[in-house]
Amino acid sequence: MLLENQVETDVLVIGGGIAGCFAAIKAKEQGLDVTIVDKAYAGKSGASIGACRSWMVYNPEWGVDFNECMNAFNTEGEYINHREWDEIILNESLAIYHDLVSWGVKFPPD
């Protein structure tokens, strides 16, 4: 039996993992109507459930060299990462970390 459900939305997010949920929240903060579509329950399927202990945040005030962080990031990704994307991710990681903390996300200590 084919089921069809038409939904009008400003933003359609495919995938309810960490990135999808984050994108949906940020779009909703802009006053947009958001719909998330996932194969299971948001946050309960896909790669995000295994990534909960693999966060890397870059803060230049911590005195850590950016290139050291990039090298660690590439090592964790077994050198199959796209370096330009990694650079964007690290440069935006602190702001994203602060957003998540402000939403009540608890991070494990170092």
Q: Where are each of the predicted segments found?
A:
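Generic alpha-helix initiation/capping and coil-helix boundary signal
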Residues: 2, 16-20, 86
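Conserved N-terminal/central alpha/beta ligand/cofactor-binding core
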Residues: 39-110
